[in-house]
Amino acid sequence: MEQTKKWGFWLLTAFVVGNMVGSGIFSLPSSLASIASPFGATSAWLLTGAGVLMIALVFGHLSIRKPELTAGPQSYARALFSDPKKGNAAGFTMVWGYWVASWISNVAIITSLAGYLTSFFPILVDKREMFSIGGQEVTLGQLLTFAVCTILLWGTHAILVASINGASKLNFVTTLSKVLGFVFFIVAGLFVFQTSLFGHFYFPVQGENGTSIGIGGQVHNAAISTLWAFVGIESAVILSGRARSQRDVKRATITGLLIALSIYIIVTLITMGVLPHDKLVGSEKPFVDVLYAIVGNAGSVIMALLAILCLFGTMLGWILLGSEVPYQAAKAGDFPAFFAKTNKKGSPVIALIITNVMSQVFIFSVISRTISDAFTFLTTAATLAYLIPYLVSAIYSLKVVIKGETYDQLKGSRVRDGLIAILACAYSVFVIVTGTADLTTFILGIGLFFVGLIVYPFVSNKFQKEKQA
């Protein structure tokens, strides 16, 4: 049976890299250039990479020391509490927040992919009015974009239902292709790279109020932009139930991080060495502008193809991840048992259907202002759902170290893991505080988890069993 096949190191690594390296990378060089010098941007990448490495190491050693916890952060949240009732509630809210966030992120990726398709199909931005809904005019472009997004969502659904293992191999191919695409971009950029465009490797930048921002401020501001490039680092851990070896999970998480970090740093420096600073800061499509300097008008076509390839792989990985969360939750008893139903190919069909139906609702945001407003609202709220699991995992790792679980005696590995857990906790707090600096974002995010507590008694199998006991 196909479902007995386990995923090895390279397939898991492809999910980590593919889910991290998405659409954000194409705008990051210009946004970083506006707030940091080359030295400031590089320092921010290294600082963020070091922080995420601590989280990756936490995920890695937990996957080995606690191999029975195969659902990632939701398992760690449950195991964090000695009281089963509290643990079950914590595990459920973690699942709920991450799952709801996946509906939103899936739609964001799909609409971004449709946006890049306009380079080849300009009719997708056609402004001709077709009809009105509730007094709102719907244009031909909006209608076609809705159709394209729907096809992309359910086409990906069909791929995953047909063969979950086949989808993992397809994801590997798309991830390898996107990495090779960035290697091509880097090599091509080196031919027109000019160190003179750097000016000085470090220089103060001007803030919005005209004040001069030094290296500390540059690194802090740039770190806010760079931290989002690493969301997805948890991919291999969430998929660890399908892994051939828990050591592969650890190796894939760390290797995926190092590959993504290398791409981020090098392409950032390449763009800074090809485009003049003023032009880079004002560029909406810095990658296109770099390739235009190398190959002329064909640059925009090449870049659009790379972006589409990037986003297709990211879409495939995140839709799978979004369905894997409720699937693993059902196997653990947190969600109703029907979420764990699989077909002969091992695909979690019910989890996929329900996840994608919820995503479909928000695809209406491209033609409905009401749903668009709700989509924006939930996007803000979902921010915290991707950040909290990092902190919970780090705290649980620290608990394991302090209690000495799986450590026979006080060895160097226990001290090392404890230090890593402390650093991961500190970085996770920084990420949450920085990533939700807007009080509204924080309140909405907490509200999302609060909703999880409200629905917990009605959805959780474990709660029903506790009630009957």
Swiss-Prot record:
The chain crosses the membrane at residues 8-28, 44-64, 90-110, 144-164, 179-199, 213-233, 254-274, 301-321, 347-367, 375-395, 417-437, 439-459. Gene3D superfamilies: Amino acid/polyamine transporter I. InterPro entries: AA/rel_permease1, APC_superfamily. PANTHER family: AMINO ACID TRANSPORTER-RELATED (PTHR42770), ARGININE_ORNITHINE ANTIPORTER-RELATED (PTHR42770:SF14). It catalyses: L-ornithine(in) + L-arginine(out) = L-ornithine(out) + L-arginine(in). GO terms for biological process: amino acid transport. Belongs to the amino acid-polyamine-organocation (APC) superfamily. Basic amino acid/polyamine antiporter (APA) (TC 2.A.3.2) family. Catalyzes electroneutral exchange between L-arginine and L-ornithine. Keywords: Amino-acid transport, Antiport, Cell membrane, Membrane, Transmembrane, Transmembrane helix, Transport. The lineage of its organism: Bacteria, Bacillati, Bacillota, Bacilli, Bacillales. This is Putative arginine/ornithine antiporter. It holds the Pfam family AA_permease_2. The keyword Lyase does not apply. One of its GO terms (cellular component) is plasma membrane. One of its GO terms (molecular function) is antiporter activity. It is a multi-pass membrane protein. It comes from Bacillus subtilis (strain 168). It is found in: Cell membrane.
